[in-house]
Each structure stands twice: as structure tokens, then as C-alpha cells.
Amino acid sequence: MSINDPIGDLITRIRNAQMRRKDKTSTPGSRLRASLLDVLRDEGYIRGYTTTDHGNGRTEFEIELKYFDGQPVIREITRVSKPGRRVYASVKALPRVANGLGIAVLSTPQGVMADHDARDKNVGGEVLCTVF
């Protein structure tokens, strides 16, 4: 099966699994997805993920979702830059999510990072998604 928007697919899998109160969900692996999952793990939105190699160059990530008092830690996760409409932001124009309580995940020349890291490194890029 061909996936046209791998980041949108990852976000949808996480959102659907948390709505159903699943402990884990799986997704096909890629370097961009791994970078995005690293940011979500470092910011405390997921417990972590494990990589399974199926051979033939195919990998799969099993994502361990995080809950607090029975409620998902991720209240809202939305895709910003889509295949049909890319959204880029300079350092001065980086979005603030929920007045600083959430994060925007960016793909920059220095790698995938949260908005506050991009401000610290004075770099802009493509706004992949917002998490609150």
C-alpha cells in the first residue's frame, strides 16, 4: 500500500490509538518518522518506541502511548504542512501553540526539532505538526 503523507499517517495512527485508549500502536518506519517520534518522546508526549526490522529494508515502529489519570497526554495533534500546501516559518514567525503550553514540530536544516529548540538555535523550517 502506498502512503502519500507518511507524517499525516503517523499522526492519525497516534490520534486513533489514543481515542481507543490503546497502550501501543505500530507504524511503518522511516528516518523522518523516527525523528518526529524522538521529539515527541523527548518532550514527554509518548513513552517511547521500539524498532522492528522485518528484512527487505522494511522496519516498523511500535509506539508506546502515554496517559495521565486515564486521559491521553496528547490532547490535540494536528498536521500543519501538508503535501498539497507546505507551510514554512522563519524564526520570528514560529507559531506558539496554546500560548507556549504545546509544541510545534519543525523540519529544519539542522534536523527535526521542537519550536523552542529552533528558537534557541535561531533556525526556521517547515512546520510539520502541532501538539498540545
Swiss-Prot record:
InterPro entries: Ribosomal_uS8 (IPR000630), Ribosomal_uS8_CS (IPR047863), Ribosomal_uS8_sf (IPR035987). This is Small ribosomal subunit protein uS8. One of its GO terms (biological process) is translation. One of its GO terms (molecular function) is structural constituent of ribosome. Keywords: Ribonucleoprotein, Ribosomal protein, RNA-binding, rRNA-binding. One of the primary rRNA binding proteins, it binds directly to 16S rRNA central domain where it helps coordinate assembly of the platform of the 30S subunit. Belongs to the universal ribosomal protein uS8 family. It comes from the Bacteria. GO terms for cellular component: ribonucleoprotein complex; ribosome. The lineage of its organism: Bacteria, Pseudomonadati, Pseudomonadota, Alphaproteobacteria, Hyphomicrobiales. Pfam families: Ribosomal_S8. Signal peptide: none annotated. Part of the 30S ribosomal subunit. Contacts proteins S5 and S12.
